[in-house]
Amino acid sequence: MKQPPETLKEPRKHGNMEFPCAFYDSICTITSVSHHWHEEMEILYIEGSGYSVEVDTHDVTTEEPSFYFLNQEQLHSMKLSADCLEYAMLFRPDMLSFSSYDLTQQQLLLPLLGQKLLFPSRIPLASPAGQELKTSLLR
């Protein structure tokens, strides 16, 4: 994956050295988030009318509530209406890595860390995977 230009890198740090993860939730007060990227992966959930999400300059918007997965260094932007609900979790993928080497580390985590395994851009809430994500992440 080609790294986006440094000028679009988001300067904000998410989490800290001890816990490289951050959670955000809000009723949208910001109507636009310009193109940017960050070193963290992001799991984003949006519901409401009148929103759009762009990932790597491709519009992945739908009218239904959805989860969006933003891989490391993936360029993205959003336009949101005032009635949208937004939940976001940003994390450094290396925090998932084990200190011991096993099959999960070899077949799942190392490809994820090396960006050889990528999440899909969007998972609809109505799908079985979307329902599982809702149960796991939106408690």
Please place each PLM-identified region on the residue numbering.
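A hydrophobic/aromatic-rich effector-binding and dimerization subdomain
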Residues: 2-19, 75-139
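Generic protein-terminus/edge-of-domain signal
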Residues: 1-67, 106-107, 117-120
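A short, compositionally biased micro-patch
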Residues: 46-48, 71, 81
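Short beta-turn/strand-loop junction motif enriched in small, turn-promoting residues
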Residues: 51, 73-75
